[in-house]
Curated annotation (Swiss-Prot):
The gene is guaC. This is GMP reductase. GO terms for molecular function: GMP reductase activity; metal ion binding. It catalyses: IMP + NH4(+) + NADP(+) = GMP + NADPH + 2 H(+). InterPro entries: Aldolase_TIM, GMP_reductase, GMPR, IMP_DH/GMP_Rdtase_CS, IMP_DH_GMPRt. It comes from Photobacterium profundum (strain SS9). SMART domains: IMPDH (SM01240).
């Protein structure tokens, strides 16, 4: 047993320090980023926000809507190959280039991924997604997928430390997904005692990834646009959002009417709700590691994504970053004990 004494920080532990800026307006800030990925050699240009691959977030409808802003969606893995065939038939490259095909690590998952990727050349992203990215099995699976799809962009996770980021990149991942336990409907940290404050995880993992020419996704922990900016400021190349994009028309969640008001069900992918739906209940050797909540129905996602992007642009003007890619270079974080004045309630 050992104890690490270094302080680890989450998004609520810091604020950006403002800096002199030559920018006159938020409209001058460029949020689009251009990436060339290490192993696949693929190029991608867009706003590096990703809707999470959760049942009630990462839907085909969400992908079609967010692609209008060049924002990505990681499509959840519970659609069938036939579902994907319909989606491919009804959408063009502008949508498909911004859709990630999510998969687990079983033999059936591998075959299903092959069948989906065979539908069109316009699908270029594969997201290998398991809760515990520290499994040796994940490294072997990444190698297997890389051998099968040498020109596709592969994302793998989730992990929170630089050593595992490096191992996954060396195994063939272009992007590593970073985050264990920070999500709004995730209870892994409570059930297992395992986790890592998200901002520190992003700072440390981005350093490891960038040293090898890889990229990272900061996955989880964002509850407002300021948190998304902090993730980018910490070095995340992409930021994945679940709860912030849940509860919308395009989220594809179950709508429930209660006392005359409309709500949408939102749950973690290791929750009782998810396992009841996809696995016939919680297996007797495990515990649910997610919660189920009802969110007020929020209408179309358009206003929300505009609000998030507007917040990031505003962050950039405060620190003098004319482009999103400059934000991490311009960022100085100050440690704080309060974020906002809540005398009239929270934002």
């Amino acid at each position: 047993m050992r104890i690490e004494q270094d302080l680890k920080l989450g998004f609520k532990d810091v604020l950006f320090r403002p800096k002199r800026s030559t920018l006159k307006s938020r409209s001058q800030v460029e949020l689009t980023r251009d990436f060339t990925f290490k192993h696949s050699g693929r190029q991608w240009s867009g706003v590096p926000i990703i809707a999470a691959n959760m049942d009630s977030v990462g839907s085909f409808e969400m992908a079609a809507s967010l692609s209008k802003h060049n924002v990505m969606t990681a499509i959840h893995k519970h659609y069938t190959v036939d579902d994907w065939a319909g989606f491919v038939k009804n959408n063009d490259a502008a949508v498909l280039n911004n859709a990630m095909v999510s998969t687990g690590t079983s033999e059936a998952d591998f075959q299903k991924t092959k069948d989906i990727m065979a539908l069109t050349e316009d699908l270029i992203f594969i997201c290998i997604d398991i809760a515990n990215g520290y499994s040796e099995h994940l490294v072997e699976y990444v190698q297997k997928v890389r051998a099968e799809f040498p020109t596709k962009v592969i994302s793998a996770g989730n992990v929170v430390t630089g050593d595992m980021v490096e191992e996954l990149i060396l195994a063939g991942a272009d992007i590593v997904k970073v985050g264990i336990g920070p999500g709004s409907v995730c209870t892994t940290r409570v059930k297992t005692g395992v986790g890592y404050p998200q901002l520190s995880a992003i700072i440390e993992c981005s350093d490891a990834a960038h040293g090898l020419g890889g990229r990272i996704i900061g996955d989880g922990g964002c509850s407002c646009a300021g948190d998304v900016s902090k993730a980018f400021g910490g070095g995340a190349d992409f930021v994945m959002l679940g709860g912030m994009l849940a509860g919308h028309e395009e989220s594809n969640g179950e709508v429930i009417e209660k006392d005359g008001e409309m709500f949408m069900k939102f749950y973690g992918m290791s929750s009782q709700s998810a396992m009841d739906k996809h696995s016939g209940g919680v297996a007797n050797y495990r515990a649910a590691e997610g919660k189920t909540v009802l969110l007020p129905f929020r209408g179309p996602v358009e206003n929300t994504i505009q609000d998030i992007m507007g917040g990031i642009r505003s962050t950039c003007t405060y620190v003098g970053a004319a482009q999103l890619k400059e934000l991490t270079k311009r960022a100085t974080f100050i440690r704080v004990q309060e974020q906002e004045n809540n005398v009239y309630g929270k934002e």
